[in-house]
């Protein structure tokens, strides 16, 4: 997959980015997930 789906774990500093208009949300402790 070239992009990550909603709810997928992500890293705002590397790796594939979130699909479409979603962004990598990091609520804390480095645990980031794609959100719309």
From Swiss-Prot:
Protein name: Delta-amaurobitoxin-Pl1c
Origin species: Pireneitega luctuosa (Tangled nest spider)
SUPFAM superfamilies linked to this entry: omega toxin-like
Sequence similarity: Belongs to the neurotoxin 07 (Beta/delta-agtx) family.
Predominant localisation class: secreted
Highest taxon listed in the record's lineage: Eukaryota
UniProt function note: Binds at site 4 of sodium channels (Nav) and inhibits the fast inactivation of cockroach channels. This toxin is active only on insects. Has a potent activity against S.litura larvae.
A GO biological-process term: envenomation resulting in negative regulation of voltage-gated sodium channel activity in another organism
The keyword Secreted is assigned to this record: yes
Record's keyword terms, sorted: Disulfide bond, Ion channel impairing toxin, Knottin, Neurotoxin, Secreted, Toxin, Voltage-gated sodium channel impairing toxin
Domain free text: The presence of a 'disulfide through disulfide knot' structurally defines this protein as a knottin.
InterPro entries listed in its UniProt record: Beta/delta-agatoxin_fam (IPR016328)
